């Protein structure tokens, strides 16, 4: 038995990190990110982030006037995973990670595992509790278990939530309004599923969502995460499946995002010949890195499990 495995038997809390570094943590979002907790009778938020090259990290946000160093994180594994519990932080508080690079520079990063984010042009992460939504799609879920998904009929309507219909020249429908508009149209036209162009958080409208910065956050352009859950729930109650585009091929170079997350390549391939998509000006994931594998697998399963998405188009 390897020493790491012996340690895990003594302290099961090390298991998420162990699996993460093996590329086998399929629910890394349950550990990393910002999670509401109560410790020693005090409610607050525990923050965890992976940053293998960082010299130091602090959590900054509305709760400390965005002052670097006010809430320094500590390494929980002696290596690359950082953690901090901050009492008093609450849902919807905006935050970022202030990373001190090995070269001494300060960079401000959104949380790769954030469940919610500010609406562009702002780009901070938001504390959010994704639990507690009351689903009403039991009948749909039961029917899908019996359905012949390979040979059964399927007619898919692809659409972009931000431009399909607008309330005026610039304002799109929110998630709830979108469902109310879509359902009668899809039924009338005989579609079985709606396929959404990417709804994971992204900064640039012109990308149509194909330059993702938030792999665990539905875009706040149209509402909150639970608003998006309600969208899926309404579709299922109407007998309509929901497929979403999931974009693991590349990610943008926005300074607050995954690119050079701790001042050096973390999520992207460090070899520029493999790590950059020259045509798009975006970065390519380091698919051979275990931590990146855990990140991407967790993202894919997150949408299926937490949002009841019926399928992903890659």
At which residue positions do the language-model features occur?
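Substrate-binding/active-site clefts of carbohydrate-active enzymes
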Residues: 141-151, 160-311
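Short beta-strand elements bearing conserved aromatic residues within extracellular beta-rich modules
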Residues: 57-59, 95
């Amino acid at each position: 038995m390897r020493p790491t495995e012996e340690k895990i038997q003594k302290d099961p809390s090390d298991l998420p990190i162990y699996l993460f570094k093996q590329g086998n943590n399929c629910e890394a979002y349950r550990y990393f990110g910002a999670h509401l907790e109560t410790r020693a009778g005090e409610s607050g938020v525990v923050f965890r982030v992976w940053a293998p090259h960082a010299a130091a990290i602090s959590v900054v946000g509305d709760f400390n006037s965005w002052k670097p160093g006010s809430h320094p994180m500590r390494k929980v594994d002696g290596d690359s995973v950082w953690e901090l519990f901050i009492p008093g932080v609450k849902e919807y508080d905006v935050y970022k990670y202030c990373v001190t690079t090995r070269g001494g520079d300060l960079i401000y990063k959104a949380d790769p595992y954030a469940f919610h984010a500010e609406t562009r042009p702002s780009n901070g992460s938001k504390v959010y509790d994704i639990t507690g939504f009351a689903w009403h799609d039991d009948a749909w879920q039961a029917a899908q278990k019996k359905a012949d998904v390979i040979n059964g009929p399927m007619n898919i309507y692809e659409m972009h939530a931000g431009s399909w219909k607008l309330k005026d020249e610039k304002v799109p429908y929110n998630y709830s309004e979108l469902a109310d508009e879509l359902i009668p149209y899809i039924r009338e036209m005989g579609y079985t599923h709606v396929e959404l162009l990417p709804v994971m958080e992204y900064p640039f409208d012109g990308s149509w969502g194909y330059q993702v910065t938030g792999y665990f956050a539905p875009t706040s352009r149209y509402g909150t995460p639970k608003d998006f859950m309600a969208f899926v729930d309404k579709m299922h109650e109407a007998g309509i499946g929901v497929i979403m585009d999931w974009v693991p091929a590349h990610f943008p170079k926005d300074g607050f995002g995954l690119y050079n997350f701790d001042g050096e390549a973390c999520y992207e391939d460090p070899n520029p010949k493999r790590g950059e998509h020259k045509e798009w000006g975006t970065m390519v994931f380091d698919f051979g890195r275990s931590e990146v594998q855990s990140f991407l697998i967790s993202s894919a399963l997150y949408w299926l499990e937490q949002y009841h998405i019926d399928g992903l188009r890659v």
